[in-house]
């Protein structure tokens, strides 16, 4: 029986191999186009990578000359960081100053008496207030722990309640204000006051003491060389004429009570010229006598003290002195309380006994020649009493922060003070034992890190440009930081764009920029990149011969120079990388500015790289269409060959069958004879 031949299955005549060999020749154009497509895609990806590297460099250099450049950053250090620290702004002056913390700002923190662990809080409308902030809620009664949770849910950033366990069966309730400052007193109203009284948290304030601070004529005395006898007393105020003053003792009982505060207002008022006291003695008139039409005058007094020419010709210079109010300490030191307002408005003063331990007297000095000082009569206040109630177990009472700066005592309601030292925020944590020195210095570490980042990104871009524009294998082997995979990938890109003059020109421009001179001020010490410790040969000193790697444009860092330069030349380094040469407040020169502008032509929308990738997009689309056309033709060609060879194989099989039939017939005929 003849073999059954099925085209494409038994492949009796090796037609599949014939078709395959024929199709390989037909696939040459397709293979060539596919390789070209891969080349286009690789080039496009490479251009995108170059764009990324250039963008990294642009971001790095922009940070060196932008508004938030690291050369303007400041750091503050304190000799007593646990008591006072500082946070400088970028515009803060480079200086050192002393700050003494006399007192930190505190908030009211009131404890109850010991309470039973199973105590129930009665129902009612509970109202708490801290200055003008109020917390009010209706409580239906229940456990103390539930009451505390309900209060805390409604009083965020105003007050806080907590339970302190004293023993197994005893506990205490703590309610505290979250707002510091002497004016931010914690007060209770409605059921809250009743509950505070019930738990022994507050009690009624005692009657006011009779020994409040008053100023009396028979108790004041001269202030230095200023006469106190000219001081005028009225029902509500005291008037201190020019060139006068007084010192009034403060009762020891008031000075010893830390909750007592003395308050009063003072203002300086201009007086008419005719009321100004004369600078020299004036003798009265000698007198006259008249009778009818005759008038006789007495002879003028002769003191036998002739005036000097200087006294006769030079009038006294007017004096303006707004430092008028002082507190006298026990050791005799006079502490100024702040100047008067020059516009005649009242200046309010508060003297807290807790702020001036051991104070002995209030001193008023009027050194002015054309102003009188008017002072309201002082009032003595017990700051612990609030609405007639005082805390019975205060863990802490509200008080202002108090510091001494430049010899002036300053009070603020918060421990964060940003309006005393220009562009510097003081952070108060604790009282200082002695004045702390705060130094404002440049942030040299931030500047150094920014420069190192710039060098790293610049060198990475320069390495990529060298790989793409040259064909020397040593360019890759010199890059020791490359991993094995990165080195293999770089080998595929080696010399890919060696005919791209835009990249070669861009590389030369970068080298010119980093090696150029940028004069700014006449006395600038650093006008070139290499003087700051960054150059193509920074790691060596002196001439060491020509090195091929140093001719490729990589930057090196001399860390000693880089550490030393910002110490005394931070402004020069800032100007080196970005400088306003024409005074229009816009940076228009410097290394960072020039690099940014140079790379902008590559990375901007419609720039060199965008143009290259756009062209490649067009080529990729065209190549993909060509591939689709070629693949379609090849499929038809292959199908046509399979059909023709199948028909040929079928014909051969048919002929073979006919041949077999004839052979069989002949064999049968011979065997029949």
Curated annotation (Swiss-Prot):
The reply to whether Aminoacyl-tRNA synthetase figures as a keyword in the UniProt entry is no
Name its cellular compartments: Periplasmic flagellum; Periplasm
Polar residues compositional bias: what residue ranges?
650-673
What Pfam families does the record tag this protein with?
FliD_C (PF07195), FliD_N (PF02465)
The biological processes this protein is annotated with in GO are: bacterial-type flagellum-dependent cell motility; cell adhesion
Primary place of residence? periplasm
What are the alphabetically sorted keywords of the record? Bacterial flagellum, Coiled coil, Periplasm
Transmembrane annotation, as ranges: none
Q: Which InterPro entries match?
A: FliD, FliD_C, FliD_N
Q: Can you list the GO cellular component terms from the UniProt entry?
A: bacterial-type flagellum filament cap; bacterial-type flagellum hook; periplasmic flagellum
Spell out the family assignment given in the record's similarity comment. Answer: Belongs to the FliD family.
Quaternary structure (record): Homopentamer.
* PANTHER family from the UniProt entry: FLAGELLAR CAP/ASSEMBLY PROTEIN FLID, FLAGELLAR HOOK-ASSOCIATED PROTEIN 2
Quote the protein name from its UniProt record: Flagellar hook-associated protein 2
Name of the coding gene: fliD
């Amino acid at each position: 029986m003849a073999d059954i031949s099925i085209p494409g299955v038994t492949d009796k005549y090796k037609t599949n191999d014939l078709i395959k060999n024929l199709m390989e020749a037909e696939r040459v154009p397709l293979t060539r186009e596919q390789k070209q497509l891969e080349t286009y895609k690789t080039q496009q990806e490479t251009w995108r990578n170059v764009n990324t590297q250039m963008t990294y460099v642009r971001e790095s250099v922009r940070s060196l000359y932008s508004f938030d450049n690291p050369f303007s950053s400041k750091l503050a250090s304190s000799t007593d960081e646990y008591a006072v620290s500082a946070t400088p702004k970028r515009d803060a002056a480079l200086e050192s100053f002393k700050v003494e913390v006399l007192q930190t700002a505190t908030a009211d923190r009131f404890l109850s008496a010991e309470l039973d662990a199973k105590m129930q809080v009665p129902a009612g409308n509970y109202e708490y207030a801290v200055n003008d902030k109020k917390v009010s809620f209706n409580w239906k009664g229940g456990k103390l722990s539930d009451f505390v949770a309900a209060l805390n849910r409604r009083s965020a950033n105003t007050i806080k309640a907590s339970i302190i366990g004293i023993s197994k069966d005893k506990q205490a309730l703590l309610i505290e204000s979250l707002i510091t400052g002497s004016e931010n007193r914690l007060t209770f109203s409605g059921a809250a006051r009743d509950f505070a009284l019930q738990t022994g948290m507050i009690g009624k304030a005692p009657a006011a003491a009779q020994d409040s601070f008053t100023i009396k004529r028979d108790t004041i005395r001269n202030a230095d060389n200023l006469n106190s006898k000219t001081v005028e007393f009225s029902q509500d105020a005291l008037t201190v004429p020019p060139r006068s003053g007084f010192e009034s003792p403060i009762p020891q009982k008031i000075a010893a009570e830390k909750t007592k505060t003395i308050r009063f207002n003072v203002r300086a008022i201009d007086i008419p010229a005719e009321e100004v006291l004369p600078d020299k003695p004036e003798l009265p008139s000698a007198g006259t006598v008249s009778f009818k039409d005759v008038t006789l005058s007495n002879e003028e007094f002769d003191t036998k003290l002739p005036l000097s020419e200087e006294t006769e010709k030079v009038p006294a210079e007017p004096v303006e002195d707004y430092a008028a109010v002082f507190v006298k300490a026990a050791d005799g030191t006079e502490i100024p309380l702040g100047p008067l307002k020059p516009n005649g408005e009242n200046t309010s003063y508060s003297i807290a006994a807790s702020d001036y331990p051991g104070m002995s007297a209030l001193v008023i000095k009027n050194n002015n020649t054309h102003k009188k000082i008017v002072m309201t009569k002082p009032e003595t206040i017990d700051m612990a009493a609030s609405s007639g109630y005082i805390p019975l177990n205060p863990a802490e009472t509200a008080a202002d922060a108090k510091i001494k700066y430049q010899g002036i005592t300053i009070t603020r309601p918060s421990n964060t003070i940003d309006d005393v030292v220009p562009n510097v925020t003081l952070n108060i944590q604790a009282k200082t034992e002695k004045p702390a020195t705060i130094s404002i210095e440049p942030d040299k570490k931030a500047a150094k890190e920014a420069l190192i980042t710039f060098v790293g990104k610049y060198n990475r871009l320069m390495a990529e440009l060298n790989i793409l524009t040259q064909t020397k294998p040593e360019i890759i082997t010199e890059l020791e930081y490359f991993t094995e995979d990165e080195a293999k990938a770089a080998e595929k890109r080696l010399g890919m764009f060696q005919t791209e003059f835009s990249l070669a020109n861009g590389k030369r421009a970068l080298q010119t920029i980093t090696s150029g001179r940028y004069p700014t001020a006449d006395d600038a010490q650093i006008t070139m990149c290499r003087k700051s410790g960054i150059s193509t040969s920074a790691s060596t000193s002196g001439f060491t011969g020509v090195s091929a790697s140093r001719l490729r444009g990589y930057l090196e860092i001399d860390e000693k120079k880089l550490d030393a330069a910002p110490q005394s030349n931070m402004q020069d380094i800032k100007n080196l990388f970005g400088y306003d040469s024409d005074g229009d407040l816009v940076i228009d020169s410097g290394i960072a500015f020039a690099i940014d502008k140079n790379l902008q032509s590559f990375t901007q929308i419609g720039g060199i790289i965008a143009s290259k990738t756009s062209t490649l997009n067009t080529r990729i689309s065209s190549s993909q269409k060509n591939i689709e056309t070629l693949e379609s033709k090849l499929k038809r060609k292959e199908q046509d060959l399979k059909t023709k060879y199948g028909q040929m194989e079928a014909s051969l099989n048919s002929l073979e069958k006919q041949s077999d039939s004839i052979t069989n017939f002949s064999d049968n005929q011979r065997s029949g004879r």
